[in-house]
Amino acid sequence: MTSLCLSFMKYLLIGLLASALLASATMFATQSRQTFSGTITDDECPSADHSGMRMGSTDTACTIACVDDHTVEFVLFDGEQTYLLSDQDKSREFAGKKVAVVGTLDSTTWTIQVNSMVAAN
């Protein structure tokens, strides 16, 4: 190979590596962990208003009954937006309660990949 060809390949490789690094940094920045606050409810009553369904005597009982009886999922409602939650088992523990969820949001599916969930103060 000629030195001109080697130089071209070297610059091409450097350019590709730089592009890959930039793409990785952008992806990481858009998918960083965030804290979301709201109420654990179900996607049958996504605004956490259980007055219409009343499948239980409390919001917790109603939320769990809807998930168990209607094949729906636990979601987080923050007062404006409803988010699907990746950890349905942890969500069950906090059904009908206000929580703080730390996780990564997939903005195409509105699903939070849950890292942790605790009762809100």
Where are these regions (language model features)?
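Conserved RNA-binding domains used in RNP assembly and mRNA/RNA metabolism
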Residues: A25-N121
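Bacterial N-terminal signal peptides
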Residues: Y11-S24
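N-terminal secretory signal peptides that target proteins for export/translocation
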Residues: M1-M9
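Generic secretory/membrane-interface signal
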Residues: L4, S19-A20, F36
